[in-house]
């Protein structure tokens, strides 16, 4: 009888301990959680220049990577990146796979239904990119009867669907893939953000084969995406962004990567 009592007591202690751990985790705020972990886990693509991409040494770099580093440093946290296709980043954030997303994410009304966004740290607008010398496209709204390429899950996929009238919509994991198909003649134009298009044309070996047509459409804020009910972490991130806007870092980074300020 005594042995059975000791076994039952041990099991009860384990159960109560587990319940205590769960209760502590459930009562932690988002900021307390990352501070306890000692790191900020960031979801990003790694294939969307100039925001997030691999350099010649296969190391993550870009505008978003610098911002992630600044935020983590200001919060006294280590930094961990998790890469994946853009279409999976917001769902992954909602599922708790990372703490924030920095990957050129437009703060659209649709996305705001499932996640929150920080203050903007860049601006973006959709443009049409065509093969140089191609006729028949005057801008992103001129898509009637056209085959249009777009990055899967991007805000520009939503823009294209909103405008409508296209013959076919092809989706791609990143800008490099969509522009490769454009150059190969498989799409009439690619709908993408102006900063990403300008950077590709400037720095890619095939950039001289394509060009931007028309004016930016439907300008949006680019911001840090964060899970709902993460108010204290969101506030902390906003303070960092505001601080860097005031001390000149914001403008320096914008000029470095885009050749313009926002």
Placement of each model-derived feature along the sequence:
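Extracytoplasmic small-molecule ligand-binding "clamshell" domains
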Residues: 27-103
């Amino acid at each position: 009888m005594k042995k059975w009592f000791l076994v039952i007591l041990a099991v009860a202690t384990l159960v109560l301990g587990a319940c205590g751990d769960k209760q502590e985790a459930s009562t932690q705020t988002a900021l307390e959680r990352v501070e306890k972990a000692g790191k900020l886990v960031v979801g990003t693509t790694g294939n969307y220049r100039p925001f997030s991409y691999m350099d010649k040494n296969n190391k993550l770099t870009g505008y978003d990577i610098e911002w992630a580093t600044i935020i983590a440093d200001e919060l006294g946290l280590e930094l961990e990146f998790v890469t994946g296709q853009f279409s999976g980043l917001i769902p992954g954030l909602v599922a708790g796979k990372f703490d924030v997303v920095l990957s050129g994410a437009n703060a659209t009304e649709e996305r705001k239904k499932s996640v929150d966004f920080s203050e903007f740290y860049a601006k973006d607008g959709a443009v049409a990119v065509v093969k140089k010398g191609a006729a028949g496209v005057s801008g992103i709204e001129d898509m009637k009867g056209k085959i249009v390429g777009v990055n899967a899950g991007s805000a520009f996929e939503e823009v294209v669907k909103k405008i409508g009238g296209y013959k076919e919509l092809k989706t791609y994991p990143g800008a490099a893939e969509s522009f490769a198909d454009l150059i190969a003649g498989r799409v009439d134009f690619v709908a993408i953000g102006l900063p990403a298009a300008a950077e590709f044309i400037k720095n890619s070996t095939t950039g001289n084969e394509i060009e931007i047509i028309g004016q930016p459409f439907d300008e949006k804020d680019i911001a840090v995406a964060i899970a709902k009910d993460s108010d204290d972490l969101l506030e902390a991130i906003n303070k960092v962004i505001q601080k860097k806007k005031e001390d000149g870092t914001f403008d320096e980074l914008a000029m470095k990567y885009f050749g313009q300020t926002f």
